Amino acid sequence: MIEGNLLIRASAGTGKTFSLATRFIRLMLFDGVEPERIVALTFSRAAAQEIYEALLKRLWKAAASAEGVATERRNLLKNFSEDKKRAIDALKIAWTPATFADLLRKVVNAQHTGSIATLDSFILRLVGNFPLEFGFQNAVEVLDTKGEMDALDRAKRAVLERT
C-alpha cells in the first residue's frame, strides 16, 4: 500500500512530526510492517523524542475510544485518492480501539530497537553491529572529552613518528 522511502525536509512548525507519525502508523496498519522494521531518523534527540511521543499519543487516543479511531482514520486517509481509499477498504481493517491498542503495544515493545532515532545514533549502532564491514578491526566506542583528547594525542604522535 505505502510505496517507497520518504524524506521530509521542511522548516520548523510545518507538520513534519505529524507526517512522520502518520507514515509510521500507515506502514503498520495498511502494510503490516512491524515497528522495528521502520526507521525514522532526525538530527536531534529532542526531535526523535517528539516523533516518538506524537506516535504514542495518536495511537493511545485511537485505542481509548471510537471517537479517537474516527479521528485517526480521517488522519490516515487524508490526501489519498479514491482508488487508494478503495484499496484500503479492501484490506478489511478493523477500525476499532483494540486494533490501535495492538499497534500501541507493538510500538512500546519495540522501543529498544531505536527505530526512531538520531542519524548519529543510528549510524553508530550500524557501525557497532558490523565493525568489520565498515573496515574497523576493533569494537567501536563513543569517546568522552578526555578519551577524545587522548585519541587525538595518540594520532598526532603516530603522524610525527612517521615523518
Please report, for each region that a protein language model flagged, where it lies by residue.
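Amphipathic alpha-helical interaction segments
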Residues: S121, D150-A151
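P-loop NTPase Walker
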Residues: M1-G135
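Short coil/turn segments at secondary-structure boundaries
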Residues: Q137-V142
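Accessory nucleic-acid engagement/destabilization modules that flank
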Residues: R154-T163
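Acidic, metal-coordinating catalytic cores used for nucleic-acid/nucleotide bond scission
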Residues: A46-A47, D144-G147
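Short linear X-Pro dipeptides
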Residues: Q111-T113, M149-D150, R157
